Amino acid sequence: MLHYAVVFLVIALVAALFGFGGIAAGAVGIAKILFFVFVIMAVVTFVLSLLKRG
């Protein structure tokens, strides 16, 4: 499950690169939304993996 948290974090960082960096001007809004969605998914998955271990 920790693997998924890392994957979601990487996807969020890539979305942030496109959304906040201004690389893809047409997709800025979508990239910003995806960034926050995947950050939330990464945090939730990380917390669930900690709860599963403990």
From Swiss-Prot:
Question: Which keywords does UniProt give here?
Answer: Cell membrane, Membrane, Transmembrane, Transmembrane helix
Highest taxon in the source lineage: Bacteria
- Asked if the record carries the keyword Transmembrane helix, the reply is yes
GO CC term (a single one): plasma membrane
Could you tell me the membrane topology recorded for this protein?
Multi-pass membrane protein
Q: Where in the cell is it found?
A: Cell membrane
**Residue ranges crossing the lipid bilayer per the database entry:** 5-25, 28-48
The Swiss-Prot or TrEMBL record describes its family as follows: Belongs to the UPF0391 family.
A Pfam family of the record is DUF1328
Q: Which residues form a coiled coil?
A: none
Organism field? Acidovorax sp. (strain JS42)
Q: What is the protein name given in its UniProt record? A: UPF0391 membrane protein Ajs_3511
Q: Which cysteines are joined by disulfide bonds?
A: none
Q: InterPro entries, alphabetically?
A: DUF1328 (IPR009760)
